[in-house]
Every structure is written in C-alpha cells, then in structure tokens.
Amino acid sequence: MSKRSKSLRAADAKIDRDKLYAPLEAVRLAKETSTSKFDGTVEVAFRLGVDPRKADQMVRGTVNLPHGTGKTARVLVFATGDRAEAATAAGADIVGSDELIDEVSKGRLDFDAVVATPDLMGKVGRLGRVLGPRGLMPNPKTGTVTPDVAKAVNDIKGGKIEFRVDKHSNLHFIIGKTSFDDTKLVENYGAALEEILRLKPSAAKGRYIKKAALSTTMGPGIPLDSNRTRNLLVEEDPAAV
C-alpha cells in the first residue's frame, strides 16, 4: 500500500460516517484530515432533490462569498469603446471584441469568468459550444451580461461566484483555502447555503437538500448537517438546528 493510500485511510478513520457534522466542526475536521502539503481548496458539495432536466427545477445563480475563495479570478470582458475602457480600469484581465471572440472560438481559455455587454451577445452567443460546457457563458440572470461591466468585474474579483446544478443534481462550491480562518470558511459556507435555500424551486418536491459534504483538495468528504441554518459558528448546540 502506498504512503498516500495509508494517509487517506488514516484520515478517513477519524470521520464518523453515521454522524452529520456541524459546519464549524466539519471545517476543523477537514483541516485535520487534509493530506496535502500545500494550501488546498475547501469545497462543499450538495446533492439536491431536483430534476435538472426540467426547466422549472433548475437551480442556478450567484453568491457573494464574504471572504472570497482565496483565488483572484481572471476575468475576460467582451466590450468596445468606453465600456472596454471601464472594464480595464476595473481590473479585467482580458478585454476585447471581434478579435477576442475569434481567439476564444479557436480554444483560448486562460480565464475563469466571462462578462459581455448586451450589444455583443449576438456574436458572443456563437461561443456557446466552447463556453457553455465550462459554465462560462455570460447570462443576464447571473449579472454577466450587462452594460455596467465595471461593476461585474468588481463583483467577480471580490468573491462573487456562479453556480449551477449539474445533470446529477449536484452543486459544488469552493468556499476558500485550508489557510483560511475557521470562522471565514463557515461564513462563506453560510452564504452559499442561504442562497441555495433561497433559490429552492417551487416545483421541487420532497427533501430539497438530500446530502451535503465538505472536503479539502486531498482529503475525505465530511458529512454536513445541512438542516443547521442558524448559529453556524457553534459546534454542538441541538437548539440551533
């Protein structure tokens, strides 16, 4: 057995699989069981009781994480004229129009988020096959198709992330790095949870959040008590559930 396998088994042995952990307790345990030697990512995964094949059960939106993700996103903006200048001034990493659209169509993907002005969406729409599968296609519902490109860039750079339930009814959120203070990770988790609950489709029946788990880049998943929506910074407090 490899040293890596032994480390994972030892980490997994510290987790009670019959228990749903409070967020603060899960964060501390995730750090304790992380086997990476670098500043790993902390992620939360939700299994939702929705059928994403049905339009009225799609869960999609954005959330502003109060403490960001620990990574500054590279933002590409499709804009011209004054709006292009505003995007650059706001800190956009890549700004352009026709030539840039052509570059992306040929496979340029050195960015994490895309913003476009409404007047260019007729052309940007042709990039659906490239951007769509990667969750990068600009959309008015997520604020990434907008005339106010400066605000969109500032929001994304400040920790705003976009999410969408996948075909298996799962949602994944990066809520920070293992170097983050425990409180910051829990507060980021709370912001994500609050937004997911707010977006519950009226057509969804039965239990909405079926499962939730927190993990690090190279660590085991820790079952979360997603029913706990208040007093998230308390480890053990049954009255807070």
From Swiss-Prot:
Among Gene3D superfamilies, the record links this protein to: 3.30.190.20, 3.40.50.790
* A single cellular component GO annotation: large ribosomal subunit
An example of a GO molecular function for this protein is: tRNA binding
**One Pfam short name:** Ribosomal_L1
Keyword Ribosomal protein recorded: yes
Q: Name one GO biological process term.
A: regulation of translation
Classification via PROSITE patterns: RIBOSOMAL_L1
Q: Which keywords are on file for this protein?
A: Repressor, Ribonucleoprotein, Ribosomal protein, RNA-binding, rRNA-binding, Translation regulation, tRNA-binding
The record's comment on protein family reads: Belongs to the universal ribosomal protein uL1 family.
Q: How does it assemble?
A: Part of the 50S ribosomal subunit.
According to its UniProt entry, what is the function of this protein? Binds directly to 23S rRNA. The L1 stalk is quite mobile in the ribosome, and is involved in E site tRNA release. Protein L1 is also a translational repressor protein, it controls the translation of the L11 operon by binding to its mRNA.
Instruction: State the protein's name.
Output: Large ribosomal subunit protein uL1
The species this protein was found in:
Streptomyces coelicolor (strain ATCC BAA-471 / A3(2) / M145)
